[in-house]
């Protein structure tokens, strides 16, 4: 913020003409004698913490007014003080707050924002009569008040006991996943738990899945054919999951105008981790979730109780978060990502709680399907929890029965966010750190902010909205899968992805030239059955071909020699059933192999292999 403070004999103004960004004002003219006139330009940096800039501006104005012994203050918006202006919506709010904060101790006259104004001023002309100040969002160190913080509990779903977390409880916890999540929540760091890059970073490069794009911003990736296939299969999986449960797919823009009050208020709640930029006279942002577009769409819908619960789903390709460069870690923390995002409109809290429970089980199902077990934490405001204890205990009991696990419960003393309740589910990586993926949140604020209403007879009701990502970002899902693959190696198992997600599900390797024709027939039969199979026709030794198949994490490696041609029984190495130093082999007919792979994949999404069938002509991407 830039300010110009003038000790004035008088300031007189008259608003002449509106601009497009003018506020509706009751006071269009005014005069104040013996005053401190404060010309103010609100800048873009002020948007990061409007409360702080208001506080700092008021302190500076009060200090100057007291030094000059004046009790009259004019607040005058004056854009010409800066070439880096903040959004009009933010400026209006900040100016109004400054007026409000000063009004208790001073007579305040505020000129309207966004009008062409005529003004006259008489400066007193003494050494302190003209002062310019740069006001920042820096928060000065305040006297620390006793702060009420969240309380954390372990909930045993068997006997429904809540045990408040303390050092003794932490030392006795046996569930490594739950312990890792709890330590993360309590910000307990242990030396030696992080050494170098997490394994998935090596895997994404080595397996030609994806890599950083050096010509883009940090945290943005290029995706190679194998990685694009995996990401598309994961996207197909979530699409099927939500559509089967009544989700209606939509698509909304990635960019939004911050002059829209609802958009800006929702964006400001997320803090500084945003891509914001100016284009022409517009202040724009890149979305960090699909909330913005879906809420604007719901605002324009004529919603009735019979439509509830109404679920809109979007795979936001992409969402953007301007994470700190030092925090960027592979697929776990990046700046552009693919987020499956469903928002459910509910007529009341009862319906919202029913939907919350359904979506909890949907999220947990994804961990079952990916074979990446979750640790979970419920978070509720104290008031909400006290009113709905029985409902929560019912979920905790069912969770214990289904998964045999306890959960963490966080109780917040009051509502700090737009939600009163949420659940987060996390996979634990090889460093013992949680990768938070699925989430469900009960939003009690956004419907009113965005003007979303349900027409219930003669009444207009602001509904409850659930935010749900059934898997978390697609990139984090893959991160969890790859970290889990590494953890398998610590248990003497070869690293692997689930067969339905592995780019090359089967590879056929002929022992010699005379076996190639038969081997090619086998590969074609596999492909005709919807299996992603390729054919290793490279002029390498048999040992190298088998090792290459292992490096590529091929699930089923088929070797064809004389015996296989004579008997029709193929020698198949099954990766998922093997040990690191001991391959599991079976003799299977082509039909038996097709049946085994089909049974392995079950009803998971299917896509063809986006690479040439012959390994000799498959390009190398890095």
From Swiss-Prot:
Superkingdom of the source species: Archaea
Catalytic activity: tRNA(Thr) + L-threonine + ATP = L-threonyl-tRNA(Thr) + AMP + diphosphate + H(+)
Cell compartment(s), UniProt: Cytoplasm
Cofactor(s) needed for function: Zn(2+)
Sequence segments annotated as region (Editing domain): 1-141
BP term (GO), one: threonyl-tRNA aminoacylation
Coiled coil region boundaries: none
Chief subcellular location: cytoplasm
GO cellular component: cytoplasm
Pfam family, one: tRNA-Thr_ED
Protein keywords: Aminoacyl-tRNA synthetase, ATP-binding, Cytoplasm, Ligase, Metal-binding, Nucleotide-binding, Protein biosynthesis, RNA-binding, tRNA-binding, Zinc
Binding residues annotated for Zn(2+), in chain numbering: 291, 343, 467
Uppermost EC category: ligase
Gene Ontology molecular function terms on file: ATP binding; threonine-tRNA ligase activity; tRNA binding; zinc ion binding
Comment text on domains: The N-terminal domain is an archaea-specific tRNA-editing domain that hydrolyzes incorrectly charged L-seryl-tRNA(Thr). Catalysis of tRNA editing is performed by the charged tRNA itself.
Family indicated by similarity: Belongs to the class-II aminoacyl-tRNA synthetase family.
Subunit structure: Homodimer.
Biological role stated in the UniProt entry: Catalyzes the attachment of threonine to tRNA(Thr) in a two-step reaction: L-threonine is first activated by ATP to form Thr-AMP and then transferred to the acceptor end of tRNA(Thr). Also edits incorrectly charged L-seryl-tRNA(Thr).
Protein name, as recorded: Threonine--tRNA ligase
